[in-house]
Amino acid sequence: MHTMNKTAESVWDNCLSFIKDNIQEQAYKTWFEPIKSVELTDNALYIQVPSKFFYEWLEEHYVKLLKVALTKELGKNAKLLYKIKMENTYGNKLPFTEQLPSAHRSPVRTQEIDVPVQQKNPELRNPFIIPGIRNLKIESQLNANYSFDNFLEGDSNRLARSAGMAVANKPGGTSFNPLLIFGGVGLGKTHLAHAIGVEVKEKYPEKTVLYISAEIFTQQYIESVKKNNRNDFIHFYQLIDVLIIDDVQFLSGKTGTQDVFFHIFNYLHQNGKQVILTSDKAPVDMQDIEQRLLSRFKWGLSAEIHQPDYETRISILKNILYRDGVEMPEEIIEYVARNIKSNVRELEGAIISLIAQSSFNKKEVTLELAKQVVEKFVKNVKREVSIDYIQKVVSDYFQLDLEVLQSKTRKRHVVQARQLAMFFAKRYTKASLANIGSQIGDRDHATVLHACKTVDNLVTTDKQFKKFVDDINKKLSL
């Protein structure tokens, strides 16, 4: 068939019938039915898609399929060009079109995120300052006290700290982009995130660094939608060289904010800017965060900060005493370190409170005083039950050997015991599902999730099983 007789429509129809045979119907309906063919010139087919995100999705997931389909129709020099036609861009009532090359030809630099036509370059609004000031002075929001100097290294944070250092030395230039630091409360995620920012500012004063919590980011975004300046919001964030977002799990369930963050993230990543995220969960345990965002969180490095071990706890205490110029007997430091294990924040709180008590009451710090202070702290902290302890309690309750509980056996009573251990590990510890699985017989996170669901279901339908749960719960709550 000569190209002469071909129309954009006929070429695209043929492509579609090929594509339809090669993907699931639902995917076809979602991603291919909305596309319109626009024009055909030589060996280039223009297709119209409804949004920039739509284009990114096609390029990310279906570019090979599109290429094969088009090559069949137009030969090996086939080109696919996109026209993005947004019927209604945010705050801009006229539709507008922009053209983008497809990834499999040498792309001209694509335009930045959809700028409405009539808004060529008005004042850019910085969500942090009064609008109307032309020269954007962006306050980094960093806390200079949170530096690498006072972020002590130990086994519990070595990976995260070294990755943080590498990023601070070469922001955007390592494979740790994004760098996601995750772990329980009070272990130093925020401190490390600030430390990276502080270090970058020291080494590269010309770089724009911004620290912001996901909660404030969300509030700013909602505000920008209300005021009809979502684009300004996006452009502001595109100016940042090192963006640090704290507690990114706060975005869960907030689809609008996730969508805008997705665009900002893509832009920053493609332009070699650095993104640093902190979270109290590993990506695999985050609920209600879109898949496309989660997959991007995994592009770089996810580094977990664990609870500090005994040696690290001692160093942390000594460091605080040294900074405050206070001497304290070794046995007292050891006593505090042995008894406060859950997190760094409580450890610091206890020692600071101890120093305050002694200077305030003009008393020597004695072991007795240390016991009183530590008791106050430990009382207020729900005792962290370890996964090992949970497995031991469950095994004893069912009179099983620990090895049997962790084995691969599928005997019903063992499977139930194993599922209960997983269920209580999720309830009583801050460990990630993957971590729980690996400690209970080397299972994956999906197994743990399934176990928790099974236990939830059985508790409501099986009296005997509910008794198991209540009994073990009592033993663990002692």
UniProtKB/Swiss-Prot annotation:
Region (Domain IV, binds dsDNA): 359-478
Binding site for ATP: 186, 188-190
Entry annotated with the keyword Cytoplasm: yes
GO MF entry, a single one: lipid binding
Key words of the record: ATP-binding, Cytoplasm, DNA replication, DNA-binding, Lipid-binding, Nucleotide-binding
Chief localisation class: cytoplasm
Region (Domain II) location: 82-140
Membership in a protein family: Belongs to the DnaA family.
PANTHER family: CHROMOSOMAL REPLICATION INITIATOR PROTEIN DNAA (PTHR30050:SF2)
Oligomer status and interactors: Oligomerizes as a right-handed, spiral filament on DNA at oriC.
Function statement: Plays an essential role in the initiation and regulation of chromosomal replication. ATP-DnaA binds to the origin of replication (oriC) to initiate formation of the DNA replication initiation complex once per cell cycle. Binds the DnaA box (a 9 base pair repeat at the origin) and separates the double-stranded (ds)DNA. Forms a right-handed helical filament on oriC DNA; dsDNA binds to the exterior of the filament while single-stranded (ss)DNA is stabiized in the filament's interior.
Name assigned to this protein: Chromosomal replication initiator protein DnaA
Species of provenance: Flavobacterium psychrophilum (strain ATCC 49511 / DSM 21280 / CIP 103535 / JIP02/86)
This protein's encoding gene: dnaA
